[in-house]
Amino acid sequence: MKKKTAIFLTALLLLCMVIPAFAEQAVTFPQGTITSEPIELFSEHFHVSIDAGVYVPGDLMERWEGIYRAMETVSGIRFEDGAYARKIEVRCRANETSEEGEFYVPVAYQNQIDLYPADLLANGSYAILHEMSHTLNYFYHEASEDWESRLMAEGFAEYTAYQTAKWLEENDPALAYAVGPSQQILYNVALEDEETLYTEELSHWMKEPYPYSGNPGYSEGLRFMAYLERVYGNDTAWMTALDQATKGKRVEREVSALKASYGEDVLDGFYPWLKENSALFDYGDMDAPVDLRGVQQVTLYPTFNRLENVARLSGRSVRYSDLYVDLSQAMLYLRDYKGKDVSAAQLKVDCLTTVDAFDANGNLLTTIDKEGVIPMDGVAYVRLNGIGTLYGLDLIGWGEFYW
């Protein structure tokens, strides 16, 4: 009897050792689509209209709702509490050059946002953060197309986008990866000659955006919003007061709203504060690693612009811990959306651990030992095993070019 029991237990143990190899389930990722006709998407807070001929990620609305919630958290106010609050209407226009990043301009006005296909990917593009910040602002007062107010309007949008990106890095690193590093925002609003800023009163730069900066109006505006938040506890009180300031031109109304909200000395205190706190806006090492150690899976999307056409996980090194990377959407994007010949496409990897490559059914195709190149034929996704650092994960052999 004891012998039979021992044989049974041995067989059971062997079975348990074998089962996991066959029970491995394929990892599922959001599946994108290329629109063949105009479509509309709806979620709790968004109504999105997308032209035909646009690649749309499968988790687009989920991502935007996540940004919406994060933005309310960092700003301390709710979209829905604004006197002008409505569902956010987003229009995505198809354009042959629309994936050219900085060479086009997304816009927002009241509850309306115009974007382009590259912004839908949210892969290193924080445009949706900036434009959504505009809607949050405009929900609390009557919007204006008067560019004299660029410091206030663009400053609030850029600072709120920065704060949101920072929050995501700490609380939702997968979504943070999608919108790009917060330090990129600081890089874009660097001040080239800060001393010249102090030669004029702030109200002057509200009328004439400061020219010696990465982005006039945005640069000094972001810093002013940081000042309001850190010194007075918020950078939003002026928005509701703006509608009450009905006399004078736009900048005069903004000055009145600021003084009514924060006190008569609010403008005078900015320069002394900025001189003591300018280090807050140092963007730091632009090659610092991307930290994805708390992320289970991400999708690689190609980047197309006038400087480079690439399909890589990141332009920086990446820290990971058992990270799954979807490559199927990149192949769909290249082949069916951009019309590229991917028959000779290869996966090039350079990291500190092994990398397993799987087909769409979860079958292990091959394992790369730290560094190597394999054909993409049949590969749907990979797993970066263990804890390590990735120095490169690229799809090559389809006509890519690098800056």
What is each stretch, according to the model?
Residues 4-22:
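Sec-dependent N-terminal signal peptides of Gram-positive bacterial secreted proteins and lipoproteins
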Residues 17-27, 33-34, 335:
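Intrinsically disordered, low-complexity Ser/Thr/Pro-rich tracts
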Residues 24-26, 246-365, 375-403:
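Beta/coil-rich, acidic/histidine-enriched accessory regions frequently appended to metallopeptidases
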Residues 25-28, 38-44, 52-91, 96, ...:
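Zn2+-dependent metallopeptidase catalytic core
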Residues 49-60, 116-123, 141-148, 209-214:
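Second-shell loop/turn segments in exported
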Residues 74-89, 143-150, 171-178, 236-243:
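Surface-exposed patches in mature extracellular/periplasmic domains of secreted proteins
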Residues 105-190:
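Zinc-dependent metallopeptidase catalytic helix centered on the HExxH motif
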Residues 186-267:
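Active-site-proximal alpha-helical
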